[in-house]
Amino acid sequence: MINSRLAVAIHILSLISMDEKTSSEIIADSVNTNPVVVRRMISLLKKADILTSRAGVPGASLKKDPADISLLEVYRAVQKQEELFAVHENPNPKCPVGKKIQNALDETFESVQRAMENELASKSLKDVMNHLF
């Protein structure tokens, strides 16, 4: 299931692209969250090779131009790799609907997941930033 991680990560990356010396406290104030949440998110973005930082130097910087960072890349960096939709796991096998619901929905849900990922892949951080500035 999607939560707000993708939106928060894009928010963080947009701020960092404007000013690489922006602290996690300033970012947290903009996102309206705790600086610890921001630092965790920044850590995930570093592991995904989207951000970099240097010891002793405040802030972080983008490793690539915003136009070269797809929203899918950001999504995969911060979102657990699970299906977008979940089907309840233990429907009643004696029920005519319960015994077939998972198979009936699998193809549709997988198709929607692919469509979402394709759309995210077609959009960049720069595309979002163009709407911001």
Curated annotation (Swiss-Prot):
Gene encoding the protein: ywnA
Protein name from the UniProt record: Putative HTH-type transcriptional regulator YwnA
Cited InterPro entries: Tscrpt_reg_Rrf2, WH-like_DNA-bd_sf, WH_DNA-bd_sf
Annotated region of DNA binding: 24-47
GO terms, biological process: regulation of DNA-templated transcription
Gene Ontology CC: one annotated term: cytosol
Alphabetized GO MF terms: DNA binding; DNA-binding transcription factor activity
Swiss-Prot/TrEMBL keywords: DNA-binding, Transcription, Transcription regulation
Domain of life where this protein originates: Bacteria
HTH rrf2-type domain residues: 1-130
Gene3D superfamilies reported in the protein's UniProt record: Winged helix-like DNA-binding domain superfamily/Winged helix DNA-binding domain
